[in-house]
Amino acid sequence: DLRVTRPGFLEGIKHLKEKEGTKDYNPNTMASRQEMRTFVCAQCHVEYYCGPKAVLFYPWHNGLKVEEIEKYYDSYKFKDGHRFFDFKHKITGAEVIKAQHPEFELYSQGVHAKSGVACADCHMPYVREGATKVTDHYIRSPLLNVNRACLQCHHFTESEMLDRVSIIQDRNFKLQNSAESAVVDLINKIAKAKELGASEEQLVDVFEFQRKSQWRADFINAENSMGFHAPQEAARILAESID
């Protein structure tokens, strides 16, 4: 049987399910096998805090969307009473959030998750070994195994499936570059303002813009699917970053 054991995940999913209306959620006794085929991956392929200021935690108390995670971080206080931040930006001094690798969070907003497709369905598709059907433990990108990872559900040619993915990822890459350029432009303008004598107090609101914009751009950059796990959600997040 599949089991999840990581304390951070068990606490995180408990908070998430409580927000959704289910108290004392235990995935090992309450999740379906199909859900567990994602949860075993979500023990690590997620956003989390792991540093010297607090015990490792997953920020899912308000939900899995980028702004819901941000809301929790903004409300979180370290033991010294200071609000959450991963580091102070060297050039501007803004207190920013560093995304880890939020694959589970972005995937949860996509069509595959909504359709009940688990991580293992694509990254560990079933294979036959004699008369037995087992998951392929050669874990890799579905693009390296399109026939078994994709074509069991999508009845198109392998080349067409690869083209579809390429279009999605190319569009995301361009939008991601635009978002990151916008963040860099903002950082340079803050640096110029400080050079001209702007005080920390005068730049408080601008620091918040950097925190929000950089968090969103980094969320998609760090997520590792180049937007594929949830293309529309990735585009929304990057558009907010640019804005």
Task: Give a label for each model feature.
Residues 1-121, 125-243:
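Primarily the internal scaffold of c-type cytochrome electron-transfer domains
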